[in-house]
């Protein structure tokens, strides 16, 4: 469904990612992990068409991403950014209905089916009570859930998320990922999400891609790559991986840094 070949990405004179080669099949749930500044968001921007590659190819369903019309691209790809800068006081329902525009007939108006899609998506993201509220007057977490509802109403084949739940509380974060898991399992929705939460990624993603130093350093099934050695290599932090007693998925436990491992002028701290 997605094929990336010899991809190089950057901004101005700065090269961020180089030599990327990977494929994502329909129905995969992929977590993109790595330290701050490693290029996770850059990759999501490129896959969504917001950032043109310096070189290489991004193929979506046998079509070059750059050759797709904005309408066709929006029918295939849904994108949820880390934050949404919505400056106009549109009602939240209207924001969600914007996700239906790629499916409208040319010069056609919104249909009852479009409204049903929007209301269903708001119900799934527990934002139905915000229908008439101006999006500029809801909290940041509520606004982000409205934006996620818009992406679900879009009914894409591929959903790209860039730290999309980082502003949500624990309960809402889990609710969103349960929705994604349900759509992934029942409708074959392909999900790629850039994340910082290691254990959330291990819980929901079937495949993990670790990015560091301008490239992909590890890529594979979660059960194979979520290991102390790989996590330590990527994050330069000592960790243990255990089986969570509740869900039996791998679970990372961070260990304290030893003396001499802290960068900068860290104060001396007496350890208990």
Language model region names:
Residues 48:
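Helix-to-loop junction immediately C-terminal to a conserved catalytic motif
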Residues 97, 112-130:
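Conserved ABC ATPase "signature" region
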């Amino acid at each position: 469904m997605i094929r990336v070949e010899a991809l190089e990405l950057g901004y101005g004179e700065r090269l961020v990612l180089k030599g990327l080669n990977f494929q994502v099949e329909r129905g995969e749930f992929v977590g993109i992990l790595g330290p701050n500044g490693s290029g996770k968001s850059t990759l999501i921007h490129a896959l969504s068409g917001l950032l043109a590659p310096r070189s290489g190819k991004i193929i979506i369903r046998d079509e070059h991403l750059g050759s797709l019309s904005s309408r066709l691209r929006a029918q295939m790809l849904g994108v949820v950014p880390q934050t949404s800068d919505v400056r106009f006081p549109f009602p939240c329902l209207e924001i969600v209905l914007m996700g239906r525009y790629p499916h409208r007939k040319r010069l056609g108006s919104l249909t009852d089916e479009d409204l049903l899609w929007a209301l269903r998506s708001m119900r799934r993201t527990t934002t139905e009570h915000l229908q008439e509220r101006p999006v500029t007057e809801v909290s940041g977490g509520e606004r982000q859930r409205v934006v996620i509802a818009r992406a679900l109403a879009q009914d894409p084949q591929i959903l790209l998320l860039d730290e999309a739940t980082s502003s949500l509380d624990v309960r809402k974060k889990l609710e969103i990922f349960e929705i994604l898991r349900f759509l992934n399992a029942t409708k074959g929705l392909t999900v790629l999400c850039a994340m910082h939460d290691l254990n959330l990624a291990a819980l929901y993603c079937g495949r993990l891609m670790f990015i560091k130093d301008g490239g992909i350093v590890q890529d594979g099934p979660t059960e194979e790559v979520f290991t102390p050695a790989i996590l330590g290599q990527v994050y330069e932090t000592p960790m243990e991986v255990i089986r969570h007693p509740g869900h039996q998925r791998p679970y990372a436990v961070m260990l304290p840094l030893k003396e001499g491992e802290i960068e900068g002028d860290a104060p001396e701290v007496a350890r208990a």
